[in-house]
From Swiss-Prot:
Disulfide bonds: none annotated. This is PXMP2/4 family protein 1. Keywords: Membrane, Transmembrane, Transmembrane helix. One of its GO terms (cellular component) is membrane. PANTHER family: PEROXISOMAL MEMBRANE PROTEIN 2, PXMP2 MPV17, PROTEIN MPV17. The keyword Membrane applies. Its main location: membrane. Belongs to the peroxisomal membrane protein PXMP2/4 family. InterPro entries: Mpv17_PMP22. The chain crosses the membrane at residues 21-41, 54-72, 138-154, 161-177.
């Protein structure tokens, strides 16, 4: 088996990261959000909705991943100590500030896609009250350890790539939680046009 092709792919990816870091990471995120939402819909077994996958990919590509890129750069500039002395503060600050913010950002973006100018603020508040802390607890079971490894051992250029691999499963969870209330609404209206996920907590 010729492994040179993998070397070429790796070198091309590295060069792309150096020349177009945000675009490269965002496109990688597109693949991750595609896999996460497709897996979520497969598990739900309600039929595949490509519009929802497109929506989640759009949120990931243009909203989530670019913010993570600049957030990681901010952490690297703010906490400059080597080893664990720099990694631990990054993880703590990330999990207490940016992690919760990013979840709210994701949920809000999905609701905007579903409702547009008819955005229901009461539904948004109810959703935050119901889902915010349960999802945050799930996040804290995954991301503190993951980010400890990222900030301690992984080169900054490749952190989002490694994070994206973990995110396939995590985005499956996010896709489920972000879309679940719209599934209930569509079921009540007997509208099969939007296939969404049932609650993880039910």
């Amino acid at each position: 088996m010729n492994f040179r092709i993998f070397d070429k792919i790796g070198n091309s990816y590295k060069k792309s990261l150096q020349n177009r870091p945000v675009i490269t990471k965002s496109l990688t995120g597109t693949v991750v959000f595609f896999l996460g939402d497709t897996l979520a819909q497969k598990i739900e077994n309600r039929g595949y909705d490509p519009k929802r996958t497109l929506m989640m990919c759009t949120v990931g590509t243009f909203i989530v991943v670019p913010q993570i890129h600049f957030w990681f750069k901010f952490l690297d500039k703010t906490f400059t100590k080597p080893g664990w002395a720099g990694a631990i503060p990054k993880v703590v600050v990330d999990q207490l500030t940016f992690g919760p913010y990013l979840f709210v950002c994701n949920m809000t973006s999905v609701q905007l896609f579903h409702q547009g100018f008819n955005f229901d603020t009461h539904q948004w508040k109810d959703k935050m009250k119901k889902d915010f802390f349960p999802v945050l607890q799930k996040a804290w079971m995954i991301w503190p350890l993951t980010n400890c490894i990222l900030f301690r051992f992984v080169h900054p250029d490749y952190r989002i790539l490694i994070s994206n691999l973990v995110s396939v499963g995590w985005n499956c969870i996010l896709s489920t939680v972000s879309n679940k209330s719209f599934l209930k609404n569509n079921n009540n209206n007997n509208d099969p046009s939007i296939s969404t996920m049932a609650s993880l907590n039910e």
